[in-house]
Amino acid sequence: PYYPVGTTCYVWNLQSDDLIAQTLETLRNSPFNKIRFCVFPKSYCYNSREPRSYPYEGTPVDGSAITEDNVWGYGPDSKGNNWDFERFNPKHFQHIEYCIGELQKLGIEADIILFHPYDRWGFSTMTPECNELYLKYTAARFSAFRNVWWSFANEYDLIKNKSIEDWERYAQIIVESDPYDHLRSIHNGNQ
């Protein structure tokens, strides 16, 4: 039987090449056979730096003054974000494909977190139409990898602008867009 033994490294894939290589080497020598990580960058006390890339064309809020002490003052409505949620940044997704492929070589499942509430760029508050486009695009790019699992959200109940019905609809979009029927999950926070 297969027993998933996983870890979470939310944005390891959006770090420097050196840190990505170090993470892969650590995983190679670990008991883990699954890792959870995000498509979107994460803004949190240990993730206050800017990521290597963004999923959309546009410009982010100026993060040069963000520290671990003031990171909570920045949210999805922060001034300065200017994204085109209909124009994906292919290099961002190509890089994630590279990371998924490297995990596959190690025999590690890539449990991809599609949404999360720790956001200063506005990705957690996109319109339903933009969310649908994002899900279809992500499924089209990543579903061909045999080691992909879908995690609809990390702490879905902390994303206040999405209802249970929204999550059900997002699940249906992935089901319809992923011809390989990869495993699917959603993670709660407070509920």
Q: Which residue ranges define each predicted feature?
A:
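Active-site mouth of glycoside hydrolases
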Residues: 2-191
